[in-house]
Amino acid sequence: MIHETAKIHPSAVIEGNVTIEANVSVGPFTYISGNVTIGEGTEVMSHVVIKGDTTIGKDNRIFAFAIIGEESQDKKYGGEATTVVIGDRNVIRESVQIHRGTVQDRGVTTVGSDNLLCVNVHIAHDCVVGDNIIMGNNATLAGHVTVEDFAIVSALSPVHQFCTVGAHSFIGGASVVVQDVPPFVMAQGNHCKPFGINIEGLKRRGFEKAEIHAIRRAYKALYRNGNTLEEAKVEINKEIEAFPVLQGFLDLFEKSTRGIIR
């Protein structure tokens, strides 16, 4: 179903069970096929490929040569019906690739809302990308990666499969992430190492001074005081009641399968 207010270029090809909502525009030579829904006000520019099952929310901007909903690059993938779900107000720049999930995991690749995905970003199968994230040019996520809200993954930085990039963290350019990055932490290098707290980012997002100081103490407990991970957990846990923002550290420690960058 194509809404009467949608603007579809004559050279675009649309086939299958496609729903295009009000005020969507589809540019020349774009190909949309399968069980695809494109939400109100989304702009799909020229030469884009969108395949199903894929659901895209409202007011997104999708630039030329982006490919969304293609099969995963997992050798175990056998054509199963898996999905991509994308939220609202994302900017998806040229040649970004977002692949469908696999039945070996969640079966869905998800991207939240208000993200900036720069040129040539790759988001592999079963990734979970939150809200308000920036991924620089040629940043890549292998399968099963989680990137939490407000994280920044700078240009040319790959993230190993099953890793988590914590909320409000900052990955420097051309870094290689092979273990989990705790929330609020700045990290860089090959392999990626911690080098402080993303204080400027926290100030911009309205964190209180007391919260930032508590986050710095948690960072010192984890990296500067010679503690084991278990000892750091104990120190951080002492401040959870006064500073619930620290819960993100403990949540990551609990679910980590790759280990924490050290």
UniProtKB/Swiss-Prot annotation:
One of its GO terms (biological process) is lipid A biosynthetic process. Pathway: Glycolipid biosynthesis; lipid IV(A) biosynthesis; lipid IV(A) from (3R)-3-hydroxytetradecanoyl-[acyl-carrier-protein] and UDP-N-acetyl-alpha-D-glucosamine: step 1/6. Transmembrane segments: none annotated. It catalyses: a (3R)-hydroxyacyl-[ACP] + UDP-N-acetyl-alpha-D-glucosamine = a UDP-3-O-[(3R)-3-hydroxyacyl]-N-acetyl-alpha-D-glucosamine + holo-[ACP]. Its EC number is 2.3.1.129. GO terms for molecular function: acyl-[acyl-carrier-protein]-UDP-N-acetylglucosamine O-acyltransferase activity. Pfam families: Acetyltransf_11, Hexapep. Keywords: Acyltransferase, Cytoplasm, Lipid A biosynthesis, Lipid biosynthesis, Lipid metabolism, Repeat, Transferase. Its main location: cytoplasm. InterPro entries: Acetyltransf_C (IPR029098), Acetyltransf_C_sf (IPR037157), Hexapep (IPR001451), Lipid_A_LpxA (IPR010137), Trimer_LpxA-like_sf (IPR011004). One of its GO terms (cellular component) is cytoplasm. It is found in: Cytoplasm. The keyword Lipid biosynthesis applies. It is an enzyme of class 2 (transferase). PANTHER family: ACYL-[ACYL-CARRIER-PROTEIN]--UDP-N-ACETYLGLUCOSAMINE O-ACYLTRANSFERASE, ACYL-[ACYL-CARRIER-PROTEIN]--UDP-N-ACETYLGLUCOSAMINE O-ACYLTRANSFERASE, MITOCHONDRIAL-RELATED. Homotrimer. Involved in the biosynthesis of lipid A, a phosphorylated glycolipid that anchors the lipopolysaccharide to the outer membrane of the cell. This is Acyl-[acyl-carrier-protein]--UDP-N-acetylglucosamine O-acyltransferase. It comes from Aliivibrio fischeri (strain ATCC 700601 / ES114) (Vibrio fischeri).
